[in-house]
């Protein structure tokens, strides 16, 4: 393929499809992490393209913390029904039984038990040897130094000093029993690339990415949306109704919105052209301790 004849988005698309097909051919039991966000939606679209007109040859996995936005769960179920892919939803049963939540136990403990430990449970239960994720290198500094094929040991931990060289398009997927690879086909995309591709390909996304008047509270420098009656208000907090949208989606008590009037894809792209901060600025789990994301990844987080 003549790379000079492709736009940069088509080059990114071709690279991602190549990686997805490579994993499907090389591994015995791959799975695709489906977090329902914009990156997952793009990755799902690329995967459908990679195997069209056939069905996706591996399942999608959503590790549900029980604290996702209601719109996310509605979108997840509707998307699975529309495209007919095999969707596995896993919740950490011990965490649910213990009533782990972000209000009483804090973001770090909640994330570790409900997301990291929940993910490791699911990977062990189904014996997956490769897991796709939608992380991009431009999101956060620990993700910037991670390979496309990210090696994980039998405990699913990541050692940034023990990574394999990746020369051009040659990926090393050789693993021993119990080991696995996390695969990031969107590594070289930027947030702006994602939004431009969503616009060009007419990809459906969760409505929370578009600005609307929503109930929010000011907390720890973020606008937290009041998504259901489990939201615990602190002393002095008052619910306000503001025009906001989300650049990133996660557990609703830990995800900050931004004030915005952008309710179309073209308006979002215009915002991205002048944005000076990462979308991860709105994720409390990235800032709950020093080196937070790298520490979580070392422990098995995506």
Curated annotation (Swiss-Prot):
Function: With CysN forms the ATP sulfurylase (ATPS) that catalyzes the adenylation of sulfate producing adenosine 5'-phosphosulfate (APS) and diphosphate, the first enzymatic step in sulfur assimilation pathway. APS synthesis involves the formation of a high-energy phosphoric-sulfuric acid anhydride bond driven by GTP hydrolysis by CysN coupled to ATP hydrolysis by CysD.
Name of the protein this chain belongs to: Sulfate adenylyltransferase subunit 2
Origin: domain of life: Bacteria
EC assignment: 2.7.7.4
Record-linked CDD domains: Sulfate_adenylyltransferase_2
Similarity field: Belongs to the PAPS reductase family. CysD subfamily.
Keywords: ATP-binding, Nucleotide-binding, Nucleotidyltransferase, Transferase
Region (Disordered) residue spans: 280-302
GO BP, one annotated term: hydrogen sulfide biosynthetic process
Reactions catalysed: sulfate + ATP + H(+) = adenosine 5'-phosphosulfate + diphosphate
Pathway: Sulfur metabolism; hydrogen sulfide biosynthesis; sulfite from sulfate: step 1/3
InterPro entries xrefs: PAPS_reduct_dom (IPR002500), Rossmann-like_a/b/a_fold (IPR014729), SO4_adenylTrfase_ssu (IPR011784), Sulfate_adenylyltrnsfr_sub2 (IPR050128)
GO molecular function, one term: sulfate adenylyltransferase (ATP) activity
Enzymatic class: transferase
Protein's organism: Vibrio cholerae serotype O1 (strain ATCC 39541 / Classical Ogawa 395 / O395)
Pfam families, alphabetized: PAPS_reduct
Subunit and interaction comment: Heterodimer composed of CysD, the smaller subunit, and CysN.
């Amino acid at each position: 393929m003549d790379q000079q004849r492709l736009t940069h988005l088509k080059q990114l698309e071709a690279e991602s499809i190549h990686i997805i097909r490579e994993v499907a051919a090389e591994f015995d039991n791959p799975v695709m992490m489906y977090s329902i966000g914009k990156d997952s939606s793009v990755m799902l679209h690329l995967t459908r393209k990679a195997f069209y007109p056939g069905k996706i040859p591996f399942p999608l996995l959503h590790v549900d913390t029980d604290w996702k936005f209601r719109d996310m769960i509605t979108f997840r179920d509707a998307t699975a029904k529309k495209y007919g892919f095999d969707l596995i939803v896993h919740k950490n049963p011990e965490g649910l039984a213990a009533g782990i939540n972000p209000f009483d136990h804090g973001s770090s403990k909640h994330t570790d038990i409900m997301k990291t430990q929940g993910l490791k449970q699911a990977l062990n239960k189904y014996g997956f040897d490769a897991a796709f994720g939608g992380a991009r290198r431009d999101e956060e500094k620990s993700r910037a130094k991670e390979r496309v094929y990210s090696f994980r040991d039998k405990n699913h931990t990541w050692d940034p000093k023990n990574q394999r060289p990746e020369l051009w398009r040659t990926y090393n997927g050789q693993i021993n029993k119990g080991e696995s690879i996390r695969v990031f086909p969107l590594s070289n995309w930027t947030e702006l690339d994602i939004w431009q591709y969503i616009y060009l390909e007419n990809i459906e996304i969760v409505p929370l990415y578009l600005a609307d008047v929503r109930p929010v509270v000011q907390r720890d420098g973020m606008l937290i949306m009041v998504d259901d009656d489990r939201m615990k208000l602190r002393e002095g907090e008052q619910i306000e109704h503001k025009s906001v949208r989300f650049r990133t989606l996660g557990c609703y008590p830990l995800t900050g919105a931004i004030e915005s009037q952008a309710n179309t894809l073209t308006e979002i792209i215009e915002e991205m052209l002048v944005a000076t901060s990462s979308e991860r600025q709105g994720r409390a789990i990235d800032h709950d301790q020093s080196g937070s994301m790298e520490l979580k990844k070392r422990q098995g987080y995506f």
